Design a protein with these regions (language model features):
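A short beta-loop-alpha structural element at the N-terminal edge
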Residues: 27-41, 52
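Conserved GNAT-fold acetyl-CoA-binding loop/helix
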Residues: 47-68
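A short helix-loop-beta-strand connector motif used in the catalytic cores of GNAT acetyltransferases and
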Residues: 67-82, 101-104, 120
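Conserved beta-strand in the GNAT
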Residues: 82, 90-100, 120, 125
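A conserved beta-strand-loop-helix scaffold within acyl/acetyltransferase catalytic domains
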Residues: 96-111
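Conserved acetyl-CoA pyrophosphate-binding loop and the N-cap/start of the following alpha-helix
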Residues: 130, 134-142
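Conserved beta-strand-loop-alpha-helix junction that forms the acyl-donor binding cleft
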Residues: 131, 155-166, 180-184
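Conserved GNAT acetyl-CoA-binding A-motif
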Residues: 140, 147-159
């Protein structure tokens, strides 16, 4: 029996089960083109939760995202991951992805030049009943590991108020990035 499996059977002196971590109770798998619909659903739900989309715009966002995701996953412009309960591997409870863009050479530090790609973390979403269990952090750690292995020069993201503390704990910092929102 693995140590992680044994943990679930141990009990504290007060007879409560020992706390299990997200890594013990969830599995992570890569998304495929066949998963474009669930990724699009997560994306639309994420914006809905933030109050940025509702009604007909929800379905339009979902349909447009699905179409683009099918193309981008196939061409490896988008890499996604899902979390599933270890006991129910077909039940997707959370997801996250990286949108890849080539970038011009830039200094990574005073003596190293990066010439690869930038990854923008997007679509971080956990179904409401599964939140506050460490799943989003588990997905972001997977993305960080993958990005290091793939020599992605830089990871960026746009944090929601709810997600900011997760990203800060994992080493993300605020930057000087600004955004032009255009004229109405």
């Amino acid at each position: 029996m693995k140590e992680s499996e044994a943990k679930q059977y141990r009990r504290h002196e007060d007879a409560y089960p020992e706390q299990r971590t997200a890594a013990d109770t969830f599995q992570i798998r890569r998304a495929t083109t066949r998963d474009a619909d669930i990724i699009a659903w997560h994306r639309a739900r994420m914006f809905q939760d933030m109050g940025d989309v509702s009604g007909d715009a929800f379905e339009m966002l979902r349909a447009n995202a699905r179409s683009r995701l099918e193309q981008w996953i196939d061409k490896a412009h988008y890499i996604g991951w899902f979390a599933t309960p270890a006991t129910e591997p077909e039940m997707i409870v959370a997801g996250a992805g990286v949108q890849l863009q080539p970038i011009l050479p830039r200094p990574l530090d005073v003596s190293t030049i990066g010439e690869g790609q930038q990854g923008t973390i997007v679509n971080v979403f956990t179904e409401p009943q599964w939140r506050r269990r460490g799943i989003a952090g588990l997905l972001i750690k997977e993305i960080i590991t993958w990005s290091k292995n793939e020599q992605i020069d830089r990871l960026v993201l746009h944090a929601s108020d709810e997600g900011r503390s997760i990203y800060e704990r994992l080493g993300f910092t605020e930057s000087n990035e600004m955004r032009f929102v255009g004229v109405s």
